[in-house]
Amino acid sequence: MTQSNPNEQSVELNRTSLYWGLLLIFVLAVLFSSYFFN
């Protein structure tokens, strides 16, 4: 029964890593767009 907690933590960690990945891609897209427009 106690194994459900680590699983929830791993899922939460995956969500946070996914959000950081999307944020990183968004920042890179903004930098590349500003670079091309300049």
From Swiss-Prot:
Record field: transmembrane: 17-37
UniProt keyword list: Chloroplast, Membrane, Photosynthesis, Photosystem II, Plastid, Reaction center, Thylakoid, Transmembrane, Transmembrane helix
Major location category of this protein: plastid
Annotated localization: Plastid, Chloroplast thylakoid membrane
Pfam families according to UniProt: PsbL
Cellular component, GO, one term: photosystem II reaction center
Membrane topology, as annotated: Single-pass membrane protein
GO BP term, example: photosynthesis
UniProt function note: One of the components of the core complex of photosystem II (PSII). PSII is a light-driven water:plastoquinone oxidoreductase that uses light energy to abstract electrons from H(2)O, generating O(2) and a proton gradient subsequently used for ATP formation. It consists of a core antenna complex that captures photons, and an electron transfer chain that converts photonic excitation into a charge separation. This subunit is found at the monomer-monomer interface and is required for correct PSII assembly and/or dimerization.
Subunit organization: PSII is composed of 1 copy each of membrane proteins PsbA, PsbB, PsbC, PsbD, PsbE, PsbF, PsbH, PsbI, PsbJ, PsbK, PsbL, PsbM, PsbT, PsbX, PsbY, PsbZ, Psb30/Ycf12, at least 3 peripheral proteins of the oxygen-evolving complex and a large number of cofactors. It forms dimeric complexes.
Homology family: Belongs to the PsbL family.
Protein name: Photosystem II reaction center protein L
Organism of this sequence: Ephedra sinica (Chinese ephedra)
